[in-house]
Amino acid sequence: MKLKTNIRHLHGSIRVPGDKSISHRSIIFGSLAEGETKVYDILRGEDVLSTMQVFRDLGVEIEDKDGVITIQGVGMAGLKAPQNALNMGNSGTSIRLISGVLAGADFEVEMFGDDSLSKRPMDRVTLPLKKMGVSISGQTERDLPPLRLKGTKNLRPIHYELPIASAQVKSALMFAALQAKGASVIIEKECTRNHTEDMLKQFGGHLSVDSKKITVQGPQKLTGQKVVVPGDISSAAFWLVAGLIVPNSRLVLQNVGINETRTGIIDVIRAMGGKLEITEIDPVAKSSTLTVESSDLKGTEIGGALIPRLIDELPIIALLATQAQGVTVIKDAEELKVKETDRIQVVADALNSMGADITPTADGMIIKGKSALHGARVNTFGDHRIGMMTAIAALLVADGEVELDRAEAINTSYPSFFDDLESLIHG
């Protein structure tokens, strides 16, 4: 696909698609609750559609009509054995969280995904689930998909310290803990996105959170709810960066989720000197309007507890750093290696091919700016965030063309991305 290049300004206002993390969880909680759940503004990207289809295959009635998802919940013990293997597509969130959901089901399932998902290690989830009494295994010692799982009605509660900062592992164990008899304690390495905790309370569940320690008493019953999904800050991140680095630009992003566990990119933008304004804050929905303008940027250091708050935004932050004066160091981000691609290497290769100066490290990158970008051919390798990062980088290219291979990967999280880009170019 040939990308738009040499754009002189971006202007306009858009609403980004619904938050992917919250969309996944709304389907899961709605399915496990008793009664009806209605979900508004859900993301209809491929990952979320995979989760929706999996729960249909598990016997849940889910209707998508007039822009509203209606779920007839079956309760914690109401899932049915599927007739076929469960297809998780490209979604690591789906396979990991649903492994926890099925921990208490007394039937056997196989879960598989596409080529990219089949390379992602699942041992971080399978090891603690085995301690709870679940029979679960995959391929090689890292338990790569496909996974075979047989749950148990006699789940044991667990006391588990996460060896890595992972909201997916934490959430999988919380879903399992809801079905175990007794108190499970999950201790995080660093605080990660807390959508599962928030939604558990919304659906009538109980838990206690003490800093990095989460306690869930099982078993529990959940009750169907109305869920309004805010815009995804991970999708908004591409426009935040575009507005900062494309000259003569001003972008307004409406209804963006600003849950405090997800706003690391805002902290980074401010540390780099970017012009960003937050208005129309809704404390209940945890959403706001974000406005950015073209800015002179300076390098910064990104690491530690900040990383889980922006792990998915690091590819586009790397592009931002190429347009800042000085050096930006990203560290403590080895988790990037086991995303849809090895994002440390793939980001560096993609942007370096366009003229950036990025040195990959064991746990991040060293980025020297400011770089003039030029044309190149870039492959997403099936990674949606690499595709969108490249499309934003291309806007700065004055010399040559930018070709993007496997651009369809962007549909994973942002099917309307190129439509929104066109509207901002002509705004």
Curated annotation (Swiss-Prot):
Gene3D superfamilies hit by this protein: Enolpyruvate transferase domain (3.65.10.10)
Keywords for this protein: Amino-acid biosynthesis, Aromatic amino acid biosynthesis, Cytoplasm, Transferase
SUPFAM superfamilies: EPT/RTPC-like
Cell compartment(s), UniProt: Cytoplasm
Positions with a binding annotation for 3-phosphoshikimate: K20, S21, R25, S166, Q168, D312, K339
Biological process terms in GO annotation: amino acid biosynthetic process; aromatic amino acid family biosynthetic process; chorismate biosynthetic process
Active-site annotation: D312
EC code(s) of this entry: 2.5.1.19
UniProt pathway: Metabolic intermediate biosynthesis; chorismate biosynthesis; chorismate from D-erythrose 4-phosphate and phosphoenolpyruvate: step 6/7
Residues at which phosphoenolpyruvate binds: K20, G92, R120, Q168, R343, R385
Primary location: cytoplasm
Superkingdom of origin organism: Bacteria
Gene Ontology cellular component list: cytoplasm
SS bond partners: none
Recorded catalytic activity of this chain's protein: 3-phosphoshikimate + phosphoenolpyruvate = 5-O-(1-carboxyvinyl)-3-phosphoshikimate + phosphate
Subunit architecture: Monomer.
UniProt-listed PANTHER family: AROM/DEHYDROQUINATE SYNTHASE, PENTAFUNCTIONAL AROM POLYPEPTIDE
Function: Catalyzes the transfer of the enolpyruvyl moiety of phosphoenolpyruvate (PEP) to the 5-hydroxyl of shikimate-3-phosphate (S3P) to produce enolpyruvyl shikimate-3-phosphate and inorganic phosphate.
Protein name: 3-phosphoshikimate 1-carboxyvinyltransferase
Organism (species): Streptococcus pneumoniae (strain Hungary19A-6)
Chain's gene name: aroA
